[in-house]
Amino acid sequence: MPITLDPEKLAIVMKHRFQYKICRECGARNPPNAEKCRRCHSKNLRPKKFKKK
């Protein structure tokens, strides 16, 4: 994927790649508005980390 994307496409990519939550216990991906994990029903969720280069 090219690095030089237009801002609209970059916003779409960032939304789909980084707007979800990760369960700290089982590692499952959950929707951004989740309060409990879909797999293990834990409430220990964190937002997906974004690493800048």
Curated annotation (Swiss-Prot):
Keyword Ribosomal protein: yes
One GO term describing the cellular component: ribosome
Name the UniProt record assigns to this protein: Large ribosomal subunit protein eL40
Entry keywords, A to Z: Ribonucleoprotein, Ribosomal protein
Pfam hit, one: Ribosomal_L40e
Biological process according to GO: translation
GO molecular function annotation: structural constituent of ribosome
Top-level taxonomic group: Archaea
Family: Belongs to the eukaryotic ribosomal protein eL40 family.
InterPro entries: Ribosomal_eL40_arc (IPR023657), Ribosomal_eL40_dom (IPR001975), Ribosomal_eL40_sf (IPR038587), Ribosomal_zn-bd (IPR011332)
